[in-house]
Amino acid sequence: MVNQCRNCGHFFQSTPNPRRPRLFCSDRCRKAWSRKHQIPQVLKSLPRWVRAVGKRPIQCDGSPASSTDPDTWASYSEVMRSKAGDGYGIMLGDGLACWDFDHVDPADPPAQAVELLSEAIYAEVSTSGHGLHVFVRSSEPSFRRDGVEFYSHSRFIRMTGRRWPK
């Protein structure tokens, strides 16, 4: 039986199982699809998305993206269709802000991160696995204090789709 992967669109051979057909060509595609579907629609609807190489933002064609130039950003769906780079992220601004907690254990988060969940649009584990990003609506100025960074404009945040808390 030939199936088409829900994530990458490639066709793959699978053994027939009427109770549970395979939807993905690999575990990697299954995980990638799951992570893409963790991000809430309120973020997906913003035209502030870019691809990434490491923590550097790039456009869907692979050229550099700028956190201050909306002409270099794209829609979520355009970014997900692109194969440029090795990931994706969002540009902050226009009321979208992010608390960045570095060097923390997501299983034992700081109290401040837990308190922020009540106003969070979305929260996820950072790319290192040892940090948290908590996205909120705010136009307060950016700052850094006590090992916590708050960004509200002109900043790129690489996303993982690893929702926190699970």
Residue ranges and their predicted role:
Residues 31-166:
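Conserved phosphate/metal-binding and DNA-contacting active-site motifs used
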Residues 1-36:
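BZIP DNA-binding basic region
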